Amino acid sequence: LKQAVNSCQKKETIILTGLGEVSKSVFCVALNEALDGKGSICVITATREEIRNYRRELAYFYPDLPTQELYPETLPRIQVETQSLEITAARAAALRFLQGEEQGIVFVTAEALEQKLLRPSQGEAQRLKIKMGQTLDQKEIMQKLLDLGYERTEQVDAIGQFASRGEILDVYPINMNDPVRIEWFDTDIDGLRTFDIDSQRSKENLDALSIASITVFSTEEYTASVFDYCAENTLVIVDEPVRLFDMLDKFEKENKPYAEDIFTVEELKGFMQ
């Protein structure tokens, strides 16, 4: 364990063999705690079958830590309106965990690993950002939300929706766990707070808000890998590399028509060195 910790601190790749199913999870936990225990954990597996085992074992050691799978996208990429908003929100949550915005456990299958992602900087640039005290026109904000793919409704009761009444605008960003209530005083932002979607009660005051886009823009560049999203203290575990690469090779052959949307096996091997 000490040698593994030293290698991780030096950002080196380590290879372990001879661990059983339960032992893998135990070692992951021990390694994570020995490092600092404050970062997210990313577990990369060949299939979802392995995810079920890791999810069960890691939940025992981290019962309060949220878990999320980075679900693969449908290729060719299509507008999210024809996909599930819940899946889109789950992907956004997984990427937040990887980037260290929140601590959590992320599971990534070979299929998801192989797909190219939007560059983090580009996704950040397309967000709608609002700060307390900022002067903003409510109608312009609502138009921007429509441009980003959000649906206007009478009342917000699901992710990806927004609703307006008087000087109040409610929105449920796909990159947040709760909806947010934005309040105006004249043209200035006077209140930003999350609220419970069932009781409508306020939960947490915010200084700023960043709303991610739902719409897939034609100008977006998908050139990033999962590893480009990982923060410095995100612990990346690659389970059964031989089986993983066999599965990646299979997906690469099956997705030849979409070669521009996926990484080659050799490229992914290079990322892991």
Give the location of each predicted region.
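ASCE RecA-like P-loop NTPase motor cores
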Residues: 1-273
